[in-house]
């Protein structure tokens, strides 16, 4: 089997493209069921965040990439967006290296940001829950998690707080004076929404409104702060009227706040959702300030240098970790092949041996029976190597012939 990944991320695709190809907000079990139904797709892990959507796969034929792209394209709402214009294909070792760097935060818009590791772990867990991960892919992810833990403990790559959530709040502070007199509406109580809430509470605003599909989760988060309340998403119309700052971090398939919902009050809109939850046209209204994930990059750049010198140390750890993984995989593959070879030999010998013993018990000459037994075993054991050598010779594969000669202790010079 071959290991591949297909990805769309912020490096090549702007937010409007990433929004179209995002797989978040969809029925996860349905996604896994549909991708595993594709011929030659054996296992899969689907990762979808605000900055990237990536699919990690074990396949039996590289030609299946066309079918996977067609599968992905089927979830795009706007047919003008063609996945072939944006996706990146990685194969083999490149997949593992990328995933290690990704989990360590080296591939993030926010260098070293810690959230991505949790998102990768969540994706892995969902894959296991949907019986979509196999032994090899499981070993890859376990090594990735161990590597990320080592990088976090042995470097300071994540010590400067420049997460997307932190940067979003920094941006809001720049846009509004005296935030202690402002009402803040946060839409979404997931991992990012909770992080946003923590950063906002540190600014001590007048009031925080946290809206979520399930109010229980929002209530649990808001219970830690006096001036905060939990609401359902269905309460948005009345919450928008009260809010001075609206920040969205929620999985939706269409805009949940549009121009006609906001009136003439001046507001700051920050949307870190993928797909986008706040209509970008809100920024066209003179009284509003509107920012999306890509805009936040300007805030991030200021702090990036503080982490860059740590990234080289992280890279060295990753390279060593990858080398260790590949060495262990070679041993696993070798041991598996050796085990299979012995099982094959046992099967050949056991069948012929039983027949030979039966002949001896029936009075056949033991010497003749043993000679016949040895002849049959020789033919059976050498059958596949001989066929392979003939095929290699026909194809002009002298390298295969040399390899086979070495396997059987033959003279490679002849």
From Swiss-Prot:
Enzyme class: oxidoreductase
Ligase among keywords: no
Keywords associated with the record: NADP, Oxidoreductase, Porphyrin biosynthesis
InterPro entries per UniProt: 4pyrrol_synth_GluRdtase (IPR000343), 4pyrrol_synth_GluRdtase_dimer (IPR015896), 4pyrrol_synth_GluRdtase_N (IPR015895), GluRdtase_CS (IPR018214), GluRdtase_dimer_dom_sf (IPR036453), GluRdtase_N_sf (IPR036343), NAD(P)-bd_dom_sf (IPR036291), Shikm_DH/Glu-tRNA_Rdtase (IPR006151)
Catalytic activity entry: (S)-4-amino-5-oxopentanoate + tRNA(Glu) + NADP(+) = L-glutamyl-tRNA(Glu) + NADPH + H(+)
Keyword Oxidoreductase: yes
Single GO MF annotation: glutamyl-tRNA reductase activity
Protein residues bound to substrate: 49-52, 108, 113-115, 119
Gene3D superfamilies, alphabetized: Glutamyl-tRNA reductase, N-terminal domain, NAD(P)-binding Rossmann-like Domain
UniProt-listed Enzyme Commission number(s): 1.2.1.70
Positions bearing the site annotation: Important for activity: 98
Pfam families documented for this protein: GlutR_dimer, GlutR_N, Shikimate_DH
GO BP annotations, alphabetical order: protoporphyrinogen IX biosynthetic process from glutamate
Positions annotated to bind NADP(+): 188-193
Catalytic residues in the record: 50 (nucleophile)
The protein's annotated pathway: Porphyrin-containing compound metabolism; protoporphyrin-IX biosynthesis; 5-aminolevulinate from L-glutamyl-tRNA(Glu): step 1/2
Subunit comment: Homodimer.
Family statement: Belongs to the glutamyl-tRNA reductase family.
HAMAP family in the cross-refs: Glu_tRNA_reductase (MF_00087)
Domain notes: Possesses an unusual extended V-shaped dimeric structure with each monomer consisting of three distinct domains arranged along a curved 'spinal' alpha-helix. The N-terminal catalytic domain specifically recognizes the glutamate moiety of the substrate. The second domain is the NADPH-binding domain, and the third C-terminal domain is responsible for dimerization.
Additional remark text: During catalysis, the active site Cys acts as a nucleophile attacking the alpha-carbonyl group of tRNA-bound glutamate with the formation of a thioester intermediate between enzyme and glutamate, and the concomitant release of tRNA(Glu). The thioester intermediate is finally reduced by direct hydride transfer from NADPH, to form the product GSA.
Function: Catalyzes the NADPH-dependent reduction of glutamyl-tRNA(Glu) to glutamate 1-semialdehyde (GSA).
Protein name: Glutamyl-tRNA reductase
Lineage start: Bacteria, Pseudomonadati, Pseudomonadota, Gammaproteobacteria, Thiotrichales
